[in-house]
Swiss-Prot record:
It comes from Mycolicibacterium paratuberculosis (strain ATCC BAA-968 / K-10) (Mycobacterium paratuberculosis). This is ATP synthase subunit beta. The gene is atpD. Belongs to the ATPase alpha/beta chains family. HAMAP family: ATP_synth_beta_bact. Its main location: membrane.
Amino acid sequence: MPATETADKNTKSANSDTSGRVVRVTGPVVDVEFPRGSVPDLFNALHAEITFEELAKTLTLEVAQHLGDNLVRTMSLQPTDGLVRGVEVIDTGRSISVPVGQEVKGHVFNALGHCLDKPGYGEDFEHWSIHRKPPPFEELEPRTEMLETGLKVVDLLTPYVRGGKIALFGGAGVGKTVLIQEMINRIARNFGGTSVFAGVGERTREGNDLWVELQEANVLKDTALVFGQMDEPPGTRMRVALSALTMAEWFRDEAGQDVLLFIDNIFRFTQAGSEVSTLLGRMPSAVGYQPTLADEMGELQERITSTRGRSITSMQAVYVPADDYTDPAPATTFAHLDATTELSRSVFSKGIFPAVDPLASSSTILDPGVVGEEHYRVAQEVIRILQRYKDLQDIIAILGIDELSEEDKQLVNRARRIERFLSQNMMAAEQFTGQPGSTVPLKETIEAFDRLTKGEFDHVPEQAFFLIGGLDDLAKKAESLGAKL
């Protein structure tokens, strides 16, 4: 193992077990005074024993700033109810650490590494600091291998990279969490490796639903879950992604495994950082975000990478505030990604699920040198037809479709079939739709859309293409509507 990684492991420093006193409490921000020469380092974890409503608990604080005069400003990772001036605070001499190892699979942890489904579990495991350096440049191994999902719209138009960073962008209520759960169902089942899920500032109910679904799918035994949901203080929501990533890094670096890392939602990580920055008194930057936004995002994203023979494949849901893609939070995320899947409200309103906007989504490996000439040609033809259809929308709305040329009429009819054929029943929605989820092999997807763009299915009614899988499903539905392929 490289020396830098060894240094990142959880080792105590010389000034451990030094105690200070609380001098100021402002919500989750706590100022602590230490004896001269014993001021803890930045990111050190401090412990304070408090009693609130007759319950004793240990409060964890993280050093965020050195104020001078032996004062440090800390951010609490738990509610500070019951914490008062004068309470003793112990410097642990190390940063926050989480348990790592094969035994963390099948369990739920919080940002501090405490097991939630089995209290006390994992305390005797090896612990790694959540603040680690990314792998050295010479160890990186960029990949261009495609990760097949079985979803037509993804595999054809925005192919995912194995060992890459993939993001699902969308506003409120367009299906980001459902699509993340769908990817867990599809990829984790077929992947056969280890998955780590980070619930960052999202709904507690969704975390519980995921836990139950993973149990039912028999995938939980290969999955570690780390939650810091929206009812937690901002310090926890800011650190939970790092805690989950640290567990994933152990599987990559020590076990030599390919790992899937799911993060829902990366925007909440940014939002928590903004709250922390304001509480610490920093001057806000654009749109009120923290001035350190790009730095914090980079520290997280640069650690999600592939090294020699091993990889972390990351899928991140990204909430887009008010559907504004120029907002600094989603805009900062874009720079780090290999593939983007954008979920659109206009596609959602048509009842097409997953509500992916094929013209706004992209992938770095949609290149003939990677996916092959045929895949690239078919994908570009589909995009061309959909783009031309979009360009004609205003003319159709004002003058009507009858004013178009015969060639454009044919293109519009073909585009409408393509739009509907990009929809698909999902495994994560089976309980709501009553329809089983479908998986379509990449080869069949390419063949089907190739035939569709060439006009072989122009005689098949539009409704035959809606929410189906591959060519067999299309043939059955077309036959039920009185048409043959």
